Curated annotation (Swiss-Prot):
The keyword Cell membrane applies. It comes from Shewanella baltica (strain OS223). Belongs to the UPF0761 family. The chain crosses the membrane at residues 4-24, 45-65, 102-122, 137-157, 182-202, 213-233, 247-267. It is found in: Cell inner membrane. This is UPF0761 membrane protein Sbal223_0320. HAMAP family: UPF0761.
Length: 323
């Protein structure tokens, strides 16, 4: 009987996961994340040069980041723009160099375009969370400006801290020497999880539970790493874009990758937002099941002290159906 109940509980667990996936699918269709991802990809391409220009300007303001600018660029392009990172880096650096020579009006326009990207991300995520209360203009602008100015500083600080940790003599010990390559290999994954976690917890204008955001961040980071490797493999092994577009192949490659990246980001957000909805629904269903099951349990046992929990009732029902 105990083994049957354990099997029934496992069956209930997988059934719950299946129901959550169905709920997530309905949410994805309703929110049309493919259209949202296309919009964000378009805005991202428009804002790419302004964002890089503002980021490098912020890093240049701090002498501590002066020697690691090349490392930051290499890390970002290598891990976030697979297969076309080197080419894109050359073009973007050239564009940023031209943009930095512009007038005050031109630089202000670049900042506005960069803020447009942050605003589009904010609106898309709050729509996924069904947020009804909107931030005031002052609060929204302050948050956008903080992200635009402090974001590059935090990225630079994290890379400096990572370089410092890697250079510690403790990693030179024979017992820990094998850990260093593993740590370096997992570093992009850790940065991705941290970035997604921060995005899912801070951007929505409502309280988001840490575990829900962590689940969405881990799923998004795993999909991002798999997508990065898969997309790089496709571009290198099946160079159809280069055969069709020739020298302009970098443009569609970057656009497709940015679109896939936003699909992954929005999918992680949907998972995070769907978790409390599904758990609340399951909790209300369990309460209703327990209320209906108590009289049956009392009548069958003939003892008012014998009350089954909702989980036990669900497991027993599953066993009864299987028999």
């Amino acid at each position: 009987m105990t083994k049957k109940i354990e099997l029934a509980q496992i069956r209930v667990l997988f059934l719950g996961i299946w129901h959550f996936l169905l709920h997530l699918r309905r949410r994805l269709v309703e929110d049309q994340i493919n259209i949202r991802a296309g919009h964000l990809a378009y805005v991202t391409l428009l804002s790419l040069v302004p964002m890089v220009a503002v980021t490098m300007s912020m890093l240049s303001a701090f002498p501590v980041f002066k020697g690691i600018r090349g490392q930051i660029e290499g890390f970002v392009y290598e891990n976030f723009l697979p297969a076309a990172g080197d080419t894109v880096q050359v073009y973007i650096n050239e564009f940023v160099g031209n943009a930095s020579k512009g007038t005050a009006v031109g630089i202000s326009a670049l900042v506005v375009v960069a803020i447009m990207l942050i605003s589009a991300i904010d609106k898309s995520l709050n729509n996924i969370w069904r947020t009804k209360e909107k931030r005031s203009v002052v609060v929204a602008f302050s948050m956008y400006w903080m992200v635009l100015t402090l974001g590059p500083v935090l990225v630079g600080a994290s890379l400096v801290a990572s370089s410092y940790v890697i250079s510690l003599k403790v990693f030179e010990a024979e017992a820990l020497s094998g850990m260093l390559p593993i740590f370096i290999a997992r570093l992009p994954m850790l940065f991705s999880v941290a970035a997604f976690l921060l995005l899912y917890m801070v951007v929505p204008n409502q309280k988001v539970k840490f575990l829900h955001a962590l689940l969405g961040a881990i799923v998004a980071a795993l999909l991002f790493e798999l997508g990065k490797k898969g997309f790089a493999l496709y571009v290198t092994q099946f160079p159809s874009y280069e055969a069709i577009y020739g020298a302009l192949a970098t443009i569609p490659i970057v656009f497709v990758w940015v679109y896939l990246s936003w699909m992954i980001v929005l999918l992680g957000a949907e998972i995070t937002a769907a978790m409390p909805e599904y758990l609340d629904y399951e909790s209300s269903s369990d309460d209703e099941t327990a209320l209906n099951a108590k009289p049956l349990a009392d009548a069958s046992q003939g003892d008012s002290s014998s009350v089954l929990t909702s989980a036990e009732v669900t497991a027993l029902k599953a066993v009864a159906k299987s028999e």
